[in-house]
Amino acid sequence: IMELIGKGPGSKGFVWVARRIPDDCISGHANQARITTFPLESRKDKTTISSKNLKKIYNPEVTTVYAHDVIKFAREKGYFNGKDAEFSFSDTYNPLDFSGVRACEARVWSFFRRHDRSMDKYLSYIMCDTKERMPLWIVPERKLSVKDLQDAMRDHYEGTPLDMSKGQGAGPFNSVYRMTPLIYKHNGKEYFQERPVATQQTGFSFIAQMRDYAPAEAGGILWFGLDDATCNIYVPIYSCITEIPESMREGNGSILDFSWTSAFWINNWVARMVYPRYSMLYPEVKKRQGKLE
């Protein structure tokens, strides 16, 4: 995981931190910096290096790398004045606010809790009642499959207090969709709506699968889906592909021209049929998704 931010007007370059996810762990990210404190470079610790020692980056024991001036720059700008060991990248360069927790961190939480039920203890954090941060990565209760990740891309907080299919906004057909903006005012009061993983404005999504047991030419698969992940079909695009499939090719329809042979337009059409009668129609879509995928 690498998080970075430009230095802004009057300065060149950017500051950053990168951490390697342990092999038995999973992580998540949703438009909000998640790297907080991290181990600093020292003579005794060979697992961490700064950008001054990038020549060591391929050493297998290295798990943390950071810009040598990531803390120095924060001090110069007045963003941080504590001890180096207390420096948090997220709290300094991308501090959490309400939307950062409820619209971003909540998506990571929903993914984590699918694979570690103990993550339910962070519900109070997601509800903005407490301020403890979630771990950057977790050990899942079992090994994840491609299907697990496809399901995660279709998440609307089902089974949680944030479940999009519940409440007045869901209407008579338990819709998991809410129109933008997420935050709005009505009669002088401010309201908000949840931001799930799957949304109607998604252009495309994918799951990258790397299979070391398969021939190199076909070992990599990009399970690629166009439009809303809730109603799309994830298609395997192999690393040995030599031409783009007709259904995904530029020129087969456009943003203004419908095409019955365009994967985007077909997925979009199915989704638009489902939205008004979600609880009636989506179960049928889900059955077909399972068979086709």
Identify the meaning behind each predicted range.
Residues 7-293:
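C-terminus-biased signal that marks the final domain/tail of proteins
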